[in-house]
Amino acid sequence: MMRIALFLLTNLAVMVVFGLVLSLTGIQSSSVQGLLIMALLFGFGGSFISLLMSKWMALKSVGGEVIEQPRNERERWLMNTVATQARQAGIAMPQVAIYHAPDINAFATGARRDASLVAVSTGLLQNMSPDEAEAVIAHEISHIANGDMVTMTLIQGVVNTFVIFISRIIAQIAAGFLGGNRDEGESSNGNPMIYFAVAMVLELVFGILASIITMWFSRHREFHADAGSAKLVGREKMIAALQRLKTSYEPQEANSMMAFCINGKSKSLSELFMTHPPLDKRIEALRSGEYLK
């Protein structure tokens, strides 16, 4: 319910800002070109802003603390492991953070391969063997090396553009048909209240449907990150890490679309809306070598 409320508030803010932008630029919202410009502006703009803020948002959402200087042997091991794997993957050393949570989890985020972040939970460090922890870290390093954050940003931008554009095209047609009064010189948008209501409802519906697309891409990238981990540290270590995840608590995920966690929440209406494939499918993919080719 909270996510739906935030979605509606966000769209309300977008429409208000959109109106101001159109007033300042002189773009006619009733034209297809104007709608397309707006959809591209806000569809990709929101995604790239989220990407640029992803490290800050992710750290704030889990209360993570970036390690500036290792304070103990555990932090020293973590920093050395990340540094070694980053060199192997051919990326710059990411920032490394730890956050307090009982579940076994980790995530990677950041706008660029050379300005990324890897964060791990205290539950992971306490409950996983060094080999298993290495595999999880390698999974996150692979997300960075594969450019998954930018890939998902572009996908989200395309999806957002489609949702905004199609919603407003249909809303214009509905408002003109249901509330337009050309004899009185009313605008081609028709009744503005009908336009607003229809646009909001359609954005919600299309947004939910479009999330199926983004979730499919997210699951696809998880398989590739598992394969990347297997290449860095060995297939058996990654399989052992995934088997260990089966025993973990419900994971605390970073509150950012561009944060890639190792262990996605399992409760979902359908696998279509899951960010991560089921653990058994990930283990089977590693054993079959499907994504290692």
From Swiss-Prot:
One of its GO terms (molecular function) is zinc ion binding. Its EC number is 3.4.24.-. It comes from the Bacteria. Binds 1 zinc ion per subunit. The keyword Zinc applies. The gene is htpX. The lineage of its organism: Bacteria, Pseudomonadati, Pseudomonadota, Gammaproteobacteria, Enterobacterales. Its cofactor is Zn(2+). Keywords: Cell inner membrane, Cell membrane, Hydrolase, Membrane, Metal-binding, Metalloprotease, Protease, Transmembrane, Transmembrane helix, Zinc. Coiled coil: none annotated. The chain crosses the membrane at residues 4-24, 34-54, 158-178, 193-213. HAMAP family: Pept_M48_protease_HtpX. Zn(2+) binds at residues 139, 143, 222. Signal peptide: none annotated. GO terms for cellular component: plasma membrane. The keyword Protease applies. InterPro entries: HtpX_protease, Pept_M48_protease_HtpX, Peptidase_M48. One of its GO terms (biological process) is proteolysis. It is found in: Cell inner membrane. It comes from Citrobacter koseri (strain ATCC BAA-895 / CDC 4225-83 / SGSC4696). Its main location: membrane. The active site is at residue 140. This is Protease HtpX. Belongs to the peptidase M48B family. It is a multi-pass membrane protein.
